[in-house]
Amino acid sequence: MDKKSRVLIVGGTGFIGKRIVKASLALGHPTYVLFRPEALSYIDKVQMLISFKQLGAKLLEASLDDHQGLVDVVKQVDVVISAVSGGLVRHHILDQLKLVEAIKEAGNIKRFLPSEFGMDPDVVEDPLEPGNITFIDKRKVRRAIEAATIPYTYVSSNMFAGFFAGSLAQLQDAPRMMPARDKVLIYGDGNVKGVYVDEDDAGIYIVKSIDDPRTLNKTVYIRPPMNILSQKEVVEIWERLSGLSLEKIYVSEDQLLNMKDKSYVEKMARCHLYHFFIKGDLYNFEIGPNATEGTKLYPEVKYTTMDSYMERYL
């Protein structure tokens, strides 16, 4: 059996980071979790780190501002996976440029996976402001990786089900992370196809890609065939499972893009909803020669369908 790569996860206490840590351990990789000194001020993060340690992970403390400390950490592993936050509130994508410099100096990393895990920033054309900052920053990190000739894999895991299926995409202004029981906003005509992925499944696909020569210097799109669904189809799944009949309130493109008097976070959310549910930027393109698809690479992974996923909300 081939020796498993030693994996360092940066941002391992975050929403997707903790799934990557658990997937790495489950798949038998020697797993290292980098945590920043400030994480020790938060009891929930400390308890999560301890739980990783109890599962077999090695904890490493370092600041992204400590270049030599980062280099010393990177030299202990073979693969680096970054899961730093690129969210609407905490946006730290450009912090990864410090990680790129450390990896470049260390010179031993076989694969680097930057924090992506959503829409492919190189595919989305003319992203709306202010939501375009996510794509601009991710592109900067990609170009820095490529300029440094660091071996990479970019993973596009599309829409995390907890955010977009469980909420029925009710994220316009006042996010609701549980499925509605009375009425639901439908963006556009509700028929634009998107791709929904269980977060734990995403962690498995991400980790499986790190030692695979087929994913070297390529983008991996995770497109579970049964989870390529429109917003209306997800709503219909919930109605069928729950026995409810929801009132559908249709939100036009113009209404969605009316940013007047909206906060920065609300504007960011509306931009992403536009790209997902109006333009269809998750699924409106063919996978090219410099990319591949995760469920085809790893058919042994039994992914979670949205029918199954939504049962937890009953």
Curated annotation (Swiss-Prot):
Example GO BP: lignan biosynthetic process
Keywords: NADP, Oxidoreductase
Catalytic reaction equation(s): (-)-lariciresinol + NADP(+) = (-)-pinoresinol + NADPH + H(+); (+)-secoisolariciresinol + NADP(+) = (-)-lariciresinol + NADPH + H(+)
Binding sites annotated in the UniProt record for substrate: 272
Domain of life: Eukaryota
Active site: 138 (proton acceptor)
Enzyme kind, highest EC tier: oxidoreductase
Ligand binding (NADP(+)): 11-17, 36, 45, 142
Matching Pfam families: NmrA
Presence of the UniProt keyword NADP in the record: yes
Keyword Cytoplasm: no
GO molecular function, one term: pinoresinol reductase activity
Enzyme Commission number, as recorded: 1.23.1.4, 1.23.1.3
Similarity comment: Belongs to the NmrA-type oxidoreductase family. Isoflavone reductase subfamily.
General function of this protein: Reductase involved in lignan biosynthesis. Catalyzes the enantioselective sequential conversion of (-)-pinoresinol into (-)-lariciresinol and of (-)-lariciresinol into (+)-secoisolariciresinol. Abstracts the 4R-hydride from the NADPH cofactor during catalysis.
Self-association and partners: Dimer.
Protein name, as recorded: Bifunctional pinoresinol-lariciresinol reductase 3
Native organism: Thuja plicata (Western red-cedar)
